[in-house]
Amino acid sequence: MDELVSKVMDEVMKKIGASAPAEECCAPAAPQCNLTEFVGTAIGHTIGLVIANLDHQVHDALKIDPKYRAIGIISDRTGAGPQIFAADEAVKATNTECLIVECPRDTEGGGGHGCLIVFGAEDVSDARRAVEVALRETPVHFGDVYGNSAGHLEFQYTARASHVLNKVWAAPLGKAMGIISCAPAGIGILAADAAVKAANVEVLSVATPGNGGTSYSNEVNTFFYGDSGAVKQALIAAREVGLQALKTLEPSEELKSSTTPYII
């Protein structure tokens, strides 16, 4: 009987193998990690971690408020805007505070940044939940990130800025906010100009490679706020010109969303 079952299974597997390529019939392996601190991963080589009781020496060195015994961490190689906007959603949804946001020069050889975000919480369950929300929201905010071998374009939107966006870019709390980030940097100026001409928005700041607003990345990043409709209109205008300009540098390469566009 066992021999018969084995033969049947062999035939079934042969048929599956013949009818579907390996990439279609084999799902990607979920990340395996036995560390209790590990929460998960997301697009952009993003890792989520939680530490229930941070060592007091590390706590002091990071200048974290003593009341926050637990911390949540989002760290990635590619992307700052997606993870920061995702962190803003995480703070809205949990009893946590964003303690640290830093953007190292990275993108794994590209023109932009990576990101380090640290949440503080009095209860480890809140820290873990914040990391979970941020990991869930990160792919959403990669929806309007486009790239080719010559550079990248990033557009982010929220209808209601919260404490993370206020901390990082001085976004007015509760206001709609958008950001434009483009590499090479000149395309960022072109996109910013198109955005502000297209809609009635207020510019918070413009970060260039040398004015301290970026980690010497080959980008110009523009941050602005206004009514929800105006912010979206500005972003759509910037996206239209940005895509056309970046395409000229590598005409043979397709410029498409990293996930699914969400600014519509």
Regions found by a protein language model. Give the residues of each.
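Long, hydrophobic/aromatic-enriched structural stretches that serve as scaffold segments
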Residues: 93-101
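Short amphipathic alpha-helices in soluble, non-transmembrane regions
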Residues: 128-137, 234-241
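Conserved, well-folded catalytic cores of nucleic-acid-processing
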Residues: 93, 137-140, 198
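A glycine- and small-aliphatic-rich helix-loop capping segment at beta-alpha/alpha-beta transitions
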Residues: 92-93, 123
